[in-house]
């Protein structure tokens, strides 16, 4: 049983359902997918006392417009796109309101959770959309989004007026240095190259997406530009022939043939996901 909640007036630059991703399918070539910014998605659900794995609506950058079909409690987190409702707190949206995200100020990915959770089609155990693999698709204008009609008859105690503490609301314009675990081909890179990687700022390019974030900076020169293809995990820092790193993201291939200098710590990958094209990031090694 579901309840119609939003009419998509405009999906903006992209709108999909995402959750914590699908597990156990990598050996079949299916990436985990899931929310690009797990930190923001988690807080959207947590504010409403939803299960942390409940589907959320992931919006890209700006431009989305949603007509509210009935009164609903919701939470908006993630990128700042000048939403016309308060963010990082629970909000009671009224029927006939239009939720808008007109202009991006910082960050890339926006998250909306609704009390009880969205109803999303589960494919291979997850509601996360993986468009390249045709597991679900992005929403288009005119579609209706529904929530699960659960057993709750009143809002859980303490949810109304709840907000995220200031220390957990991230300033996406100023990311910290991202921590890196050593990669399996770290020895392909000279000490000079490692010092160059960790000592230089790297610029996120406009070719970055859910598959991978491409960085540009001083060219690295691994001793071998290709290896026999092997499993690749989300967050791997691959260095192709041009010497410009690519960080694999939630929809990345599950195998690859480029040497891997390291892997971004999972807790820091959400920071990278929210870096806009042109933004600079730095990395620091995790000492083992």
Q: What residues fall within each predicted segment?
A:
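Conserved "landmark" site that anchors the functional core of diverse proteins
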Residues: 1-288
């Amino acid at each position: 049983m579901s309840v119609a909640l939003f009419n998509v007036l405009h999906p903006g630059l992209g709108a999909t359902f995402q959750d914590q991703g699908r597990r156990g399918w990598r050996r079949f070539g299916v990436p985990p997918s899931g929310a690009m910014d797990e930190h923001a998605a988690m807080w959207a659900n947590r504010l409403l006392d939803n299960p942390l794995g409940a589907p959320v609506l992931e919006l890209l950058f700006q431009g989305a417009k949603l007509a509210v079909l009935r009164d609903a409690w919701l939470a908006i987190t993630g990128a700042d796109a000048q939403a016309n409702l308060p963010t990082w707190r629970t909000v009671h949206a009224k029927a006939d309101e239009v939720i808008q995200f007109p202009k991006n100020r910082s960050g890339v990915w926006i998250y909306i959770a609704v009390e009880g959770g969205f109803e999303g089609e589960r494919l291979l155990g997850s509601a996360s959309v993986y468009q390249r693999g045709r597991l679900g698709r992005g929403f288009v204008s005119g579609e209706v989004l529904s929530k699960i009609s659960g057993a709750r008859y009143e809002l859980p105690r303490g949810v109304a007026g709840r907000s995220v503490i200031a220390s957990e609301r991230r300033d996406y314009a100023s990311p910290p240095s991202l921590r890196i675990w050593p990669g399996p081909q770290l020895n392909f890179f000279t000490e000079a190259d490692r010092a160059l990687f960790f000592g230089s700022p790297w610029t996120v390019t406009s070719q970055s997406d859910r598959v991978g974030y491409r960085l540009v900076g001083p060219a690295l020169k691994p001793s071998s530009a290709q290896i026999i293809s092997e499993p690749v995990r989300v967050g791997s820092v691959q260095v192709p022939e041009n010497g410009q790193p690519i960080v694999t993201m939630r929809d990345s291939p599950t195998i690859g043939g480029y040497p891997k200098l390291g892997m971004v710590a999972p807790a820091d990958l959400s920071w990278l996901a929210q870096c806009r094209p042109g933004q600079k990031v730095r990395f620091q090694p995790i000492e083992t």
